Amino acid sequence: MFSPTALRPRYAKWLIATGLFLMLSGCVDKPNTLERVKEDGVLRVVTRNSPATYFQDRSGETGFEYELVKRFADDLGVELKIETADNLDDLFNQVGKPNGPVLAAAGLVSSEQRKKQVRFSRSYLEVTPQIIYRNGQSRPTDAGDLVGKKIMVLKGSTHAEQLAELKQKYPGIQYEESDAVEVVDLLRMVDEGQIDLTLVDSNEVAMNQVYFTNIRVAFDLGDARSQSWAVAAGEDNSLLNEINSYLDKVQKNGTLQRLKDRYYGHVDVLGYMGATTFAQHLQQRLPKYEQHFKAYAKKEKVDWRLLAAIGYQESLWQPAVTSKTGVRGLMMLTQNTAQAMGVSNRLDPKQSIMGGAKYLAYMKDQLDESIQEPDRTWFALAAYNVGSGHLDDARKLAAKEGLNPDKWLDVKKILPRLSQKQWYSKTRYGYARGGEPVHFVANIRRYYDILTWVTQPQLEGDQVAEGNLHVPGIDKSKPAQEPAPL
């Protein structure tokens, strides 16, 4: 007969050992989030495509949020891996997923609704929500003026929460939330008159106003708010504590302020250059560097006046300028480009011009053979400005739209779409300030035409010196920019 008591001596030791193992294993803590990040050697971060957060340009990855979080990853001694979210809901849903991002760095503002999903770090930037309207339209002055206006904001944003609260007081306020756009799209829609108003943070306005000349700030909607990073909800404070310590450190040592100055501290818009000013620059600045333009242009088989026009557009023929993104010198070379072109000192005008000439020739050589002159030159200039990857994206989009990807006239219509989510989401290299290369090329072509004209033997000398220079119209819709020193 089966007897349970007969089994007890046989399995007693096994049961005791098993129970002891389970008890001990329960006492072993799993690695916390910070420990896992260090063990993996990777900090996974989710963000948004925006000039104020993260995007890729000819310098590579850049943006205020990117630089701030890259320094954090460097402090941890790990690699930074960036992922971009399709919209705000997607961003918050990604944080804390298994093998997913452990941190969201995207200019986020805390709210009671968001605190149900994530936990926020200490603040690193103060921003103010601003109502944006189109110049020439009636300017709203208070919340009551929002009634009857066509308004759009990002879905899931704190701005949508603000409008929802206002609607309780002003039931006539109507607004649309969209997850198919980004802030740049909203500003463009106001600029083009597609919507009447939008609500965005002041830092986004500062970063984008130069590209959308029709937008204006109507008024601030509420007080300044704090932007923070976000981590997953829960009781594991390891990563959050490390983030707060890091943000406190960069606040105290000045790193944070330097980043703020780089991205938000300058209104680096030159404005329209009149004939007299341009003539003065031709007389006072160009002669210092003309021999270098001619020598290196000849060596690289490009027109020296085209090379000089690039230098004027980039720096106004000033050798010691540095932009907010770190490009430097007369030809405004990135560090990577300078190294690749054999430039050891970007502030040396001779070296800078040499690097610019080699880089322009390199850009032309990289283009498909199907692109013929003069389009080949304009494509090379666009690649010089925005990078060959984004240019290739625009050419592919042009082909899909039934346009000729080898003609600048067609591709320049497509490039601005790279700043619109519905288009850049379909590309390999993502968001770009696609309007910049269009204006870059247009201005250089005009400067080139001017230089070609005034450097004719019969026009050199007195006419330029006296300022008797007829300057063809420079694109006023997108002024040239003079990089401001850090």
Curated annotation (Swiss-Prot):
User: Which Pfam family, just one, is annotated for this protein?
Assistant: SLT
| One cellular component (GO) term of this entry | cell outer membrane
> What residues sit in the active site?
314
EC number(s) on file: 4.2.2.n1
Mind listing the GO molecular function terms for this protein?
Answer: peptidoglycan lytic transglycosylase activity
Which residue intervals make up region (Non-LT domain)? Answer: 30-267
Q: Which domain of life is it from?
A: Bacteria
User: Its GO biological process terms?
Assistant: cell wall macromolecule catabolic process; cell wall organization; peptidoglycan catabolic process
Tell me the PANTHER family matching this sequence: MEMBRANE-BOUND LYTIC MUREIN TRANSGLYCOSYLASE F
Provide the protein name.
Membrane-bound lytic murein transglycosylase F
Organism of this sequence? Pseudomonas fluorescens (strain Pf0-1)
Gene of this entry: mltF
